């Protein structure tokens, strides 16, 4: 049972899709004289708490930025740790997620990923494919620009083969070429750590997302922080470009 009070928010004011940038793990560890990897380990439990909070609230879709296409620029040791860590998190948590009715989806590129990571991602997807409580999109080796470029290449290939006409590409049809065509647009873009940028995360899907930035580093993030962000979202007047 959560120690935090779950706010009562009418369904029409709840975000249907939360995009979460799990930022600040390394800084959290460094500030405490620990190895950066210790911050990532702490972040695992925090992510699971966020999943539980989404279930309590009735938020149907959560996307977690686990490893970006830019993270390959980090030190070899940290990249190696993150590959193994993402693999092991899925192995440790998939049964628990399955029992909670969470459907796991992988969003990201295959190239460069360890085969063992791909195997665990695909195993989690297969195990949980029929679950309906909520969807957790694990964004591993993901980049918003890379996703759009890959989609553009697929479209160009089909057009060159005479299978697609330019006028068939619209805002409604373009998402069919993205990594996860069924992913709903992001309603709430949430980033702890005090940084105020999107970091190449779900660029297409976040066109009209409400941004909420919080100062806590991710390992200190609690369910109450998520509730506060959702309460802030519920107060926003979303006009989608209209007056």
UniProtKB/Swiss-Prot annotation:
Note on cofactor: Binds 2 magnesium ions per subunit.
Cofactor requirement: Mg(2+)
InterPro entries reported for this sequence: UPP_synth-like, UPP_synth-like_CS, UPP_synth-like_sf
Keywords: Magnesium, Metal-binding, Transferase
Gene3D superfamilies: Decaprenyl diphosphate synthase-like (3.40.1180.10)
Residues binding Mg(2+), per UniProt: 23, 210
Any Gene Ontology biological process: polyprenol biosynthetic process
An MF annotation (GO) of this entry: Z-farnesyl diphosphate synthase activity
EC primary class: transferase
One Gene Ontology cellular component: plasma membrane
Function summary: Catalyzes the condensation of isopentenyl diphosphate (IPP) with allylic pyrophosphates generating different type of terpenoids.
Subunit structure: Homodimer.
Protein name per its UniProtKB record: Isoprenyl transferase 2
Species the sequence originates in: Corynebacterium glutamicum (strain ATCC 13032 / DSM 20300 / JCM 1318 / BCRC 11384 / CCUG 27702 / LMG 3730 / NBRC 12168 / NCIMB 10025 / NRRL B-2784 / 534)
Gene from which the chain derives: uppS2
């Amino acid at each position: 049972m959560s120690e935090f009070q779950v706010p009562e928010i009418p369904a029409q004011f709840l975000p249907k899709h939360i995009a979460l940038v799990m930022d600040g793990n390394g800084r959290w560890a460094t500030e405490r004289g620990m190895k950066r990897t210790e911050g990532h380990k702490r972040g695992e439990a925090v992510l699971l708490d966020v999943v539980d909070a989404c279930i309590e609230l009735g938020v149907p879709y959560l996307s977690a930025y686990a490893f970006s296409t830019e993270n390959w620029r980090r030190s070899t040791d940290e990249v190696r740790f993150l590959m193994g860590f993402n693999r092991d998190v899925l192995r440790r948590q998939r049964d628990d997620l399955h029992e909670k009715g969470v459907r796991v989806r992988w969003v990201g590129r295959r190239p460069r990923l360890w085969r063992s990571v791909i195997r665990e991602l695909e195993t989690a997807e297969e195990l949980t494919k029929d679950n309906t409580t909520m969807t957790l999109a694990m964004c591993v080796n993901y980049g918003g620009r890379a996703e759009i470029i890959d989609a553009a290449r697929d479209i160009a290939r089909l057009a060159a083969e005479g299978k697609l006409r330019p006028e068939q590409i619209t805002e409604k049809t373009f998402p069919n070429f993205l990594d996860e065509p069924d992913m709903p647009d992001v309603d709430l873009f949430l980033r702890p750590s005090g940084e105020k940028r999107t970091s190449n995360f779900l660029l297409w899907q976040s066109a009209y997302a409400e941004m909420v930035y919080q100062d806590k580093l991710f390992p200190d993030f609690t369910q109450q922080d998520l509730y506060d962000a959702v309460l802030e979202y519920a107060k926003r007047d979303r006009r989608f470009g209209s007056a």
